[in-house]
């Protein structure tokens, strides 16, 4: 089967990511509505000598999705295909956005155990780049995956799980799109739950002193810090019992619609966006505006469905870099940023975000084998960020920081290899699954290199990734 004329088009259409930090001009665009057409598009690309990248929603800051070959737009490949409310196992098509998934799960009385703070990403894109939320006892989104189906470079479809092709599963849960096109994901979900959200400012020094205690005492803990300010906004989100009567929840209610609109849309987006535009027009004002934003932080407490607390609207555009560091190294990183940021030539408008995660066993996970703190730095769109991001990388390099795969960083193969104990095993599995780098691009070449095809030729079991592959349809 060839990709149908209804789902394929040619022409100089430009792809851009949300932040405006990456763009590309694919030779072909394809919107396959079925697994069979995804497979056909991959085969057609191979016949034409073109590379293939599956597009998400463009919320990676890197050029992870960029291609000059075939762009696979999976926006017609969406929805839940199977759900067992007893076990919580839910199978989802890969082009489904987290926003749509959360709504569908809610209708089934289910939820994701943990989420990041935006929901615009596709499920496959969020998994492939290592998207995470926060919680000292919880892992990133990929730790909620029970099984995957992928279309490999030859167009065959394979399934993998912890018991079936476990190496492919260990690699593909956070695979950067380098192993194949994820078509379905089976998630282990939990019963729907409510969160009690408590947000309040605290002096930065107190937050750092109490960091471990705060992380241990709360289901989901994070804080934001404006680099020139003295206060951080500490966010504690805790799960409620089904009755919703735990602790302070008796006095908390969901935010009324008008207040939610005022605080999230008007104040945190329109108002902050206006301050950012003022800072961009007159950079010398940025430290003052930053301190004003820090001083204006206020407290609020409310309850809502988990995904409505985890996720907040993001209308103000920015560039971002994020690194995972050992939990015990967080204080050093923040202290160095507090010391160095005021001396930067280009002032910083946006806050720093800090989150936590449990260790996991996913090969390219930034939390592989260690409890982690995530430090994310941002700069408003249109303001210079290179000096700030370079400074940040020099600080986190001192503590073996690992970069988020979907956020801006400068690391390459030689600098990444020592950070990931299973890095070379991932590259071996990639060489088996995609020996010609059909799913490659310039970003993957930088962070993974070219597949080592000689290993594939010399391997004792060269077909173990592809064995028992099935035809799509």
Question: Where do the PLM segments sit?
Answer:
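Noncatalytic alpha-helical scaffold of FAD-dependent oxidoreductases
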Residues: 1-473
């Amino acid at each position: 089967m060839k990709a149908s004329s209804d789902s394929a088009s040619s022409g100089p259409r430009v792809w851009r990511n949300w932040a405006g930090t990456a763009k590309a001009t694919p030779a072909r665009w394809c919107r396959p509505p079925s697994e069979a057409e995804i497979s056909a598009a991959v085969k057609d690309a191979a016949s034409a000598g073109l590379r293939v990248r599956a597009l998400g929603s463009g919320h990676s800051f890197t050029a992870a999705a960029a291609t000059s070959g075939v762009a696979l737009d999976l926006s017609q490949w969406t929805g839940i295909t199977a759900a067992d409310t007893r076990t919580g196992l839910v199978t989802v098509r890969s082009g489904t956005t987290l926003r749509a998934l959360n709504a569908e799960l809610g209708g089934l009385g289910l939820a994701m155990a943990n989420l990041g703070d935006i929901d615009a990403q596709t499920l496959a894109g969020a998994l492939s780049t290592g998207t995470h939320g926060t919680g000292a006892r919880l892992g990133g989104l990929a730790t909620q995956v029970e099984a995957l189906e992928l279309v490999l470079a030859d167009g065959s479809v394979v399934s993998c799980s912890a018991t079936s092709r476990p190496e492919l599963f260990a690699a593909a849960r956070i695979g950067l799109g380098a192993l194949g096109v994820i078509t379905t994901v089976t998630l282990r979900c939990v019963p729907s739950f409510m969160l009690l959200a408590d947000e309040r400012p605290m002096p930065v020094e107190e937050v750092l002193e109490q960091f471990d205690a705060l992380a241990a005492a709360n289901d989901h803990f994070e804080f934001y810090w404006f680099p020139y300010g003295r206060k951080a906004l500490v966010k504690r989100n805790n799960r409620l019992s089904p009755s919703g009567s735990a602790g302070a929840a008796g006095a908390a209610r969901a935010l009324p619609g008008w207040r939610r609109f005022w605080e999230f849309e008007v104040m945190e987006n329109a108002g902050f966006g206006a301050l950012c535009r003022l800072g961009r027009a007159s950079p010398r004002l940025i430290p003052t505006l930053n301190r004003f934003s820090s001083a204006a932080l206020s407290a609020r407490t409310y309850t809502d469905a988990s995904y409505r607390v985890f996720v907040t609207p993001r209308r103000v555009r920015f560039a971002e870099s994020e690194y995972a560091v050992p939990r015990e190294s967080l204080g050093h990183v923040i202290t160095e940023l507090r010391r160095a940021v005021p001396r930067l030539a280009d002032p910083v408008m946006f806050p720093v975000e800090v989150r936590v995660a449990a260790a996991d066993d996913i090969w390219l996970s930034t939390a592989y084998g260690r409890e982690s703190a995530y430090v994310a730095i941002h700069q408003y769109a249109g303001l210079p960020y290179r000096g700030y991001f370079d400074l940040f990388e020099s600080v986190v390099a001192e503590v073996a920081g690992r970069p988020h795969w979907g956020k801006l960083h400068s690391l390459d193969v030689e600098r990444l290899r020592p950070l990931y104990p299973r890095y070379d095993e991932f590259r071996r599995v990639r060489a088996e699954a995609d020996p010609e780098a059909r799913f490659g691009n310039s970003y993957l070449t930088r962070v993974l290199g070219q597949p080592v095809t000689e290993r594939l030729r010399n391997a004792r079991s060269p077909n173990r990734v592809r064995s028992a592959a099935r035809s799509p349809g």
